[in-house]
Amino acid sequence: MAPRPRKRVSRPKPRATSRGRGGGDEDPFFESEPKRRRGGGRDEDIESEDSDLEGVAAAAAGGVGDDGEEEEEEEEEQETAGEKKMRIAKELLKKVTDAARRRREDDEDEDEGEEAGRRRVADILLKRQFEESGRKRMELADRILQPDPEDGFKMLVKHRQPVTAVVLSKDSDKGFSASKDGVIVHWDVETGKSEKYLWPSENVLVSHHAKPPLSAKRSKQVLALAVSADGRYLASGGLDRHIHLWDVRSREHIQAFSGHRGAISCLSFGPDSSELFSGSFDRKIMQWNAEDRTYMNCLFGHQNEVLTMDALSKDRLLTVARDRTMHLWKIPEESQLLFRAPATASLECCCFIDDKEFLTGSDDGSVELWSIMRKKPTHIIRNAHPVFRNNLNSLENNVEENGIHKPESVSSAQSWVSAIAARRGSDLAASGAANGSVRLWAIEPDSKGIRPLFSLRLDGFVNSLAIPKSGRFIVAGVGQEPRLGRWGRVRSAQNGVVIHPIRLKEESEDL
């Protein structure tokens, strides 16, 4: 006889009750979980491009009231990551639609109907998508407005010794800087609030796989910094021949990578990976994995000290060295392209513009534009940072008979292009030296050349530059001395990190 089937009894679902934190026998951990998820997800949300300089814009507008800020924060806490993305997308669509409508009204084009307006909006959104994906170069240079005389560089973080490295997080909300005295600082771009990283004891460093120092005391002088794309890891390197890995959230030392026999002069993380590249005075370039804390590969090719590097992806790396060469490394293929500097120059710094073009700065004061299709520069700006005699502390009588200031020879240490940076995927770049200015450049399409934009006044050796994704400000690491030596000194300079706003014409005006 077949067994009788059991009846399935459906239990009623418990109703959600609004209890206090101490009421009932409900576990408060599960009660607060959704709220914590919503609040914690805010750091991972997509932010608008204008958020990079909210602090500077707020200061110019007079700030926002405390009540308004509290209401806005309460609204954001109730908003999930998906809802925020949808809200930002709707705001962008509304902004583009309104701009297209104003364009039609200004042109008084009665023949352009609603369908033509929709096509215009679709073209604008498609252009935005191509720019974000890197398939089209973002045009920022023509949107830059004349700098306001009251703008100028403002001190963001002070250091006691010359700053040697400055990097920004991927969302450009946070920055990191290091100086010759070994101080590493983590700071907020908007407020300037800073926190120091504390070096552990020698015993802790040895337990983290650091080799004992060659001298009686370990040198903590930092020459290079790099932050991972996810913002979890900070890497530092310097005279002690180790790459030190730090946890950004806790600011604690995690690991010390050993393998180089010379000072660590440059570091770079892959844009979308945990792979870390390091360059050293021992002429080697090494590849590490910060997530697994392992050594991966070693690249040979330079015949002298490696100075700077820039990683486009985990597959492409750009390096320059004192052997007057630049190498473009193709990591998976284990191959490299060799570029030689002009006869009068020794390359000092480099950066990617996109996957086809890159920039370098030289010790003869020139800025070079390179293409992957040519072994020589496609365009050279000579004497990009001229030095006048009144800027040289060691010289007097700096005026000729006709009263004209005479530029010093570009072989002066104050005219060396010591730092160069570009907003990746755009036509905006910047270079710095010790001649008293940071210069902004426009990169012409199809390797046609470099066009000067503006010169921003700044005293001291510009040892590092960084431009955020929005292109709305520029950060510089400044010191009285150059990054890798003491062959020059600008006594009027202040050691620290400075920031300068870049005012952009609204995109709606160009639609």
UniProtKB/Swiss-Prot annotation:
Q: What is its main location?
A: nucleus
* Subcellular location per the Swiss-Prot or TrEMBL entry: Nucleus, Nucleolus
What is this protein's record name?
Answer: U3 snoRNP-associated protein-like YAOH
Role summary: Component of a nucleolar small nuclear ribonucleoprotein particle (snoRNP) thought to participate in the processing and modification of pre-ribosomal RNA. Essential for embryogenesis.
Where the WD repeats fall, as residue ranges, is 158-197, 217-256, 259-298, 301-339, 342-380, 412-451, 457-497
State the GO CC annotations.
nucleolus; small-subunit processome
Q: Name one Pfam family in it.
A: WD40
Biased composition annotated in UniProt, kind: Basic residues: 1-18
